[in-house]
């Protein structure tokens, strides 16, 4: 049995959870609603304020989908109750971010400013000129948008310039020593 998959998911008060016969899960909460189609090989049942995920057989594919399905449903429940956020930090001379409506405009050392439109379900905040906070209820979407923004200028190992996650540690390298 999957260590993650066998754990039941508690449904908090104020959250409605529904499953259709073809395994489409809908979770509604105070922050919004998420809908996701799950694998057909997995059984999803609601038993007194908790969701139980089971599998039909012990094939390798079913075993791998068991824990995944449970984790995805748990992420949906947490998303509609608390939401998710990722913080990015801009490090470098002249690297700045600002909001223009729903658009994030960043100066990253290119000859032009980088403009990123907020996708539906994601909001941007700039608490400081060098910090960007991405918020939303879908963990996957928030992570993908943060990764897209980071990909414009990944942190480099010599000076540490670039866009990094706030909890990311950049491995630094020694520069050339030169002739002696």
Curated annotation (Swiss-Prot):
SUPFAM superfamilies associated with the record: Ribosomal protein L6
Q: Name one GO molecular function term.
A: structural constituent of ribosome
Any GO CC annotation of this UniProt entry: cytosolic large ribosomal subunit
Going by the UniProt record, its keywords in alphabetical order are:
Ribonucleoprotein, Ribosomal protein, RNA-binding, rRNA-binding
Q: Which Gene3D superfamilies does this entry report, sorted A to Z? A: Ribosomal protein L6, alpha-beta domain (3.90.930.12)
NCBIfam families listed in its UniProt record: L6_bact
Q: What do we know about how this protein assembles, alone or with others?
A: Part of the 50S ribosomal subunit.
Q: Which HAMAP family match?
A: Ribosomal_uL6_B
Which protein are we looking at?
A: Large ribosomal subunit protein uL6
Organism (species): Clostridium kluyveri (strain ATCC 8527 / DSM 555 / NBRC 12016 / NCIMB 10680 / K1)
